[in-house]
A protein has these predicted regions:
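Hydrophobic aliphatic residue packing
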Residues: 17, 27-28, 64-65, 83, ...
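HotDog/MaoC-like acyl-thioester-processing domains
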Residues: 2-7, 13, 76-80, 87-145
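Hydrophobic residues in beta-strands and at strand termini
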Residues: 15-19, 71, 118
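Catalytic strand-loop segment that frames the active site of acyl-thioester-processing enzymes
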Residues: 2-47
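Short loop/turn motifs enriched for small/polar and acidic residues
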Residues: 20, 65, 100-102
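Hydrophobic beta-strand-centered segment that forms part of the acyl-chain substrate-binding groove
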Residues: 44-95, 109-111
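Alpha-helix initiation/capping motif
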Residues: 22, 26, 60, 127-131, ...
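Residues that recognize and position ribonucleotide moieties
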Residues: 11, 26-27, 60-62, 107
Length: 145
């Protein structure tokens, strides 16, 4: 993967901590952040024209190969948050999306990243998936002005 940082647009994904997102102590259960980051990544791609329907129709996929999260401050039921996502780095066939989860009052709750591979199914979903070079046109959709 290239070590050159990418100057990315930033997408926002709103979310709210629900009762089922909390552990017995009444604070957010850590897997919720990973669920939100995954949803934010898919929403980010959809915002530039690559929604799940198009990805399936064109046999593209972006499997997750790594994810991490630092938990900075506990969220509680009812907290309204936003996930701010950007492309941190593009490699030849992989990319890194960085995420920051911020409560509506500006408190940073968590930050994390996902490494994904750009791939294409040989004959559609369910067939063999092969890594593909990320098209320059796709990268351009995420480039900040």
């Amino acid at each position: 993967m290239s070590d050159v940082k990418f100057r990315s647009i930033v997408a926002t994904f709103p979310c709210q901590v629900q009762w089922g997102d909390c552990d017995p102590a009444g604070i957010i259960f850590y897997p919720t952040y990973f669920r939100w980051m995954d949803a934010a990544c898919w929403a980010f791609l959809a915002a530039v024209g690559y929604d799940a329907k198009r990805m399936r129709a064109e046999h593209f996929a972006m499997p997750l190969v790594s994810a991490d999260c630092q938990f900075l401050y506990p969220a509680q039921q009812g907290d309204r948050c936003v996930v701010r996502s950007r492309i941190a780095r593009f490699g030849g066939k992989s990319f890194v999306v960085s995420h920051e989860v911020v409560r509506e009052d500006g408190m940073a709750l968590a930050k994390g990243s996902e490494t994904r591979v750009w791939g294409k199914f040989d004959q559609g979903p369910g067939s063999r998936l092969r890594g593909q070079t990320i098209p320059a046109e796709l990268k351009a959709l995420f480039r900040a002005a």
